[in-house]
Amino acid sequence: MSSLANKAKSKGKSSKSKSNVNTQVDELSDSIGLVVRVMTAVVDIKFDGGKVPKILNALESKKFYNGKKLVLEVSQHISDNIVRCIALDSTDGLSRNDEFIDTRAPISVPVGRGTLGRVFDVLGNTIDDCGPLEESKYIIKPIYSEIPKLTDQKIATEILVTGIKVIDLLAPYLKGGKVGLFGGAGVGKTVLIMELIHNIAKAHRGVSVFAGVGERTREGNDLYHEMIESGVINLNEKDQSQAVLVYGQMNEPPGARLRVALSALTMAEYFRDSENQDVLFFVDNIFRFTQSGSEISALLGRIPSAVGYQPTLAAEMGAMQERITSTNNGSITSVQAIYVPADDLTDPAPATSFAHLDSTTVLSRQISELGIYPAVDPLDSTSQALSADIVGEEHYEVAKEVQRILQTYKSLQDIIAILGMDELSEDDKLIVARARKIQRFLSQPFHVAEVFTGSPGKFVSLEDTVSSFKGLVEGKYDHLPEAAFYMVGSIDDVIKKAELLQKEGKV
């Protein structure tokens, strides 16, 4: 793919050649409607035959706009023969009395092995300039499906090892669980997601489905090329690829941004239910899903609720989140980047997401300002998996001791700022020294950031992580300099770095 900047061009090609919207209906008079009103992303269509389309049906234009057909989704019945629809692409060029056909089916997308290594838009059209899909390797499924029955769901108690120390030790992820990455702008949510995709594809050989919801086109392009370079996507043998990308980017209408997560989730559900796989489902960014819903809600004329969000916020979030679960066939482990407006966790958008999560990874601006990456807050991040029953007694005790030391250091910082280190007791001085080493040891070089940092990425096993921090809290490494703990992998790397610093006379 040359660039996702050419997306519109390739979308046009794929739409003309093969559309995934079911248009195989007789063009009877009662299935054709006329545009009577256009309000940017919301369009009113009149059906004179008296038979209006069902809610969530897709309507497709009879003519092309900017090289492709326009698809609308029915959202409201506002009279006996008029429906209000959400546009899933730009309405530029649309005018009154233009004709639309009721497809008599919801939006549908391709699913199956043929989707691996490809990039799609919300309608399931390929946008990567790699040609059409192989027809024998995919089927078409609607983006709306039932939530798995309670009897089919499985309780998740197995840890998903990410290779990232701060996560595996203090806020471990459950296989089949839902994880929220919380953070303001520019603290590293997308980089952390890219590293998780890289590590899990390499360590677990699992399929990842990535939903780009309302984020930058440049980031989507970077992620695609990073996956090619790391081998997650194999351009020569698509079947060997381990990821599917579905994008509804920042420049697209709110309808596309609202539905793209469901398109990607439908692809993930196929791998779980039909191929019995453990799937990783990444969403970047779940806040944009909420934001696009708010835009659509205002255009549809609904009365807003708190802070201007849509009154259906909790229902829309629940309808998507409840489909992300483990079943007897396989699991979907979801990692969702959640932008926090003005770093306010009480904002309704991130607050609504909290109820659905098993783990929260909070990215802190204060930690990123210290130059510690990933900038995960070890005290604010939580996980239901951090219990002795799931992670084991040793891991649990080490994690709690690390948190105790860091919490004590945090409570001493005001005293240090006012009176200085000399006024602390010897015990407190020791805790501060260990806490500063722990803080730096929680940093880690990432594989996906090698081109920026020049440092090779590190994948640290869970056993190494627990044993390294156990030695640290027990005081086995009190003699090593603080600088040796910064941006390394395991404790063996710390010892090597300490020896190097000593040779160079920097300690």
UniProtKB/Swiss-Prot annotation:
One of its GO terms (molecular function) is proton-transporting ATP synthase activity, rotational mechanism. Residues 1-22 are annotated as: Disordered. Keywords: ATP synthesis, ATP-binding, Cell inner membrane, Cell membrane, CF(1), Hydrogen ion transport, Ion transport, Membrane, Nucleotide-binding, Translocase, Transport. It holds the Pfam family ATP-synt_VA_C. SUPFAM superfamilies: C-terminal domain of alpha and beta subunits of F1 ATP synthase (SSF47917), N-terminal domain of alpha and beta subunits of F1 ATP synthase (SSF50615), P-loop containing nucleoside triphosphate hydrolases (SSF52540). Its main location: membrane. It catalyses: ATP + H2O + 4 H(+)(in) = ADP + phosphate + 5 H(+)(out). It is an enzyme of class 7 (translocase). SMART domains: AAA (SM00382). It is found in: Cell inner membrane. Its EC number is 7.1.2.2. GO terms for cellular component: plasma membrane; proton-transporting ATP synthase complex. ATP binds at G183, G184, A185, G186, V187, G188, K189, T190. It is a peripheral membrane protein. F-type ATPases have 2 components, CF(1) - the catalytic core - and CF(0) - the membrane proton channel. CF(1) has five subunits: alpha(3), beta(3), gamma(1), delta(1), epsilon(1). CF(0) has three main subunits: a(1), b(2) and c(9-12). The alpha and beta chains form an alternating ring which encloses part of the gamma chain. CF(1) is attached to CF(0) by a central stalk formed by the gamma and epsilon chains, while a peripheral stalk is formed by the delta and b chains. Belongs to the ATPase alpha/beta chains family. NCBIfam families: atpD. Produces ATP from ADP in the presence of a proton gradient across the membrane. The catalytic sites are hosted primarily by the beta subunits. This is ATP synthase subunit beta. It comes from Ehrlichia canis (strain Jake).
